[in-house]
């Protein structure tokens, strides 16, 4: 049984999503798919998460948000159009984006987190539908339903100990479960995010919870390199690392894997790819 996580750059376009589909189809052991929000399609593009931050700032400052809402909704619609299938989820996605601007601003410590989490959450809905339209029995699972219960620390959520028992129940499903990364739900039902880049954390937590044999982390680079491939020409790859070595690299700024994703995996002796 495997848990796989796809970063934003791996989910940025129809071409990338077709690759994701083939990766999932190629191995029936890949039963849990954790997804980030759509990333940049090119250097001039905007990440959906950054667009949601802009939307949040405009909303809380009383600025008209119609353009923000339309851009985000059209971003998801563009992927559907490029993939060439009729989505029934798009109506729900559009409503969820628009409904953010109806949430209370005053005394709402989790408003920012709720805005940001919409990127991953809506992407998971869309990807699960895309899988179903292409022969994979897939189901979207909200972190609340999955059992990803976290502490009430906006922007810095921590998984609660009892969450792992609930997550283990997901093993019983025969479907491919698509779970949004980056956020969980507090005991009083508030959306609360991990730190930025926290989809890695979700993937590791899910892998530990379902007692996966392997946790695969797909990103836009083929492995871990000795230097940044965008700065150094053809740096050599590092085929194997201990948890301690990976932790030190993550703390030093290597962005391939979030440093907080290591502990859940370490406790279960999981393998990262």
Model-predicted segments: where are they?
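Nucleotide/pyrophosphate-binding catalytic subdomain
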Residues: 1-262
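Short glycine/threonine-rich loop/turn motifs
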Residues: 268
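Conserved small/polar residues in nucleotide/adenosyl-binding loops
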Residues: 271-273
